[in-house]
């Protein structure tokens, strides 16, 4: 029998949820009113063939991965939040007395789902939210975050040094358990080894409407055409996205460019005329 996400809690637990949720607005409360997550079960039905007789409800599991993505939580952090954060517990469908799946179960589910599976389900969530008017598309904000690969970074940095003044951002460690990761830049002086999550947020709802994961060495600006389309009224991002190609792309899509422009110093004339 599959454990259901919407558990029947005690009278006190249900009363507690009602009191908390009625006191103030919350993003997850609004999202739950416009998105029906039951479609997840059909997508994940084949995951449970060899999981034994009592697996966790796939809707609950996907919601945990979804919250991890929204709030940038590790598996252990997600387990803790699902156990003690009452808004999270309500969104997940747990009773106030019920404990969530532990971090090892969450990790296995996420691995089975995979990046492509998550993207497929995530896009369906976005479309439901858009169709219900939760997402306005008035202004899209593009940005990226760094994902650190779980590798022996000290050993990798020793190998990475000396490959040019700034190192080789295309360096591949063939013995790494995460061979698709690459060295990238947080700043001119700081590097990291891993991936980038390129995200687009709908400004009015503060909901992430598109995501793309790349190796850490991929420049932010190159990803704008894959993440912004003509549904956006305006798009903005930091100076990393300021290029003539990106401005031209947005214009062709009918999107107003609010990209922050780099400060360009007046160039010196190539030729000086002397009398």
Which ranges hold each PLM region?
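Polybasic low-complexity intrinsically disordered regions
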Residues: 80-83, 101-256, 260-262
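Short Lys/Arg-rich cationic patches that frequently serve as NLS/NoLS or arginine-rich RNA/DNA-binding motifs
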Residues: 3-6, 158-163, 264-267, 271
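Charged, often Cys/His-bearing segments associated with DNA-binding zinc-finger transcription factors
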Residues: 1-35, 41
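Basic, low-complexity intrinsically disordered segments
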Residues: 43-125, 129-134
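Short amphipathic alpha-helical "interface-anchor" segments enriched in bulky aromatics
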Residues: 28-32, 36, 83, 142, ...
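Short, solvent-exposed helix-loop connector elements
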Residues: 48-50, 272-275
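Short, charged, surface-exposed secondary-structure boundary motifs
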Residues: 222, 245, 266-274
């Amino acid at each position: 029998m599959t454990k259901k996400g919407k558990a029947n809690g005690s009278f006190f637990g249900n009363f507690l949820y009602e009191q908390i949720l009625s006191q103030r607005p919350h993003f997850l409360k609004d999202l739950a009113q416009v998105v029906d997550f039951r479609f997840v079960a059909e997508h994940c039905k084949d995951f449970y063939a060899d999981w034994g007789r009592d697996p966790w409800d796939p809707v609950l599991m996907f919601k945990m991965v979804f919250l991890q993505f929204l709030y940038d939580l590790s598996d252990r952090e997600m387990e803790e939040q699902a156990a003690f954060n009452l808004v999270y517990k309500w969104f997940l469908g747990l009773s106030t007395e019920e404990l969530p799946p532990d971090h090892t179960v969450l990790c296995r589910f996420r691995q089975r789902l995979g990046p492509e599976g998550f993207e497929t389900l995530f896009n369906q969530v976005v479309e439901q939210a858009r169709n219900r008017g939760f997402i306005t598309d008035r202004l899209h904000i593009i940005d990226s975050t760094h994902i650190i690969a779980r590798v022996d970074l000290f050993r990798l940095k020793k190998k990475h040094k000396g490959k040019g003044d700034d190192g080789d951002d295309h360096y591949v460690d063939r013995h790494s358990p995460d061979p698709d990761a690459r060295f990238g830049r947080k700043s001119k002086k700081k590097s990291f080894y891993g991936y980038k999550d390129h995200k687009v947020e709908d400004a009015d709802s503060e909901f992430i409407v598109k995501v793309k994961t790349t190796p850490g060495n991929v420049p932010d600006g190159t990803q704008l055409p894959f993440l912004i389309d003509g549904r956006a009224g305006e798009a903005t991002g930091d100076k990393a996205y300021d290029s003539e190609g990106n401005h031209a792309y947005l214009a062709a899509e009918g999107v107003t460019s609010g990209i922050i422009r780099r400060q360009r110093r007046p160039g010196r004339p190539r030729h000086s005329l002397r009398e």
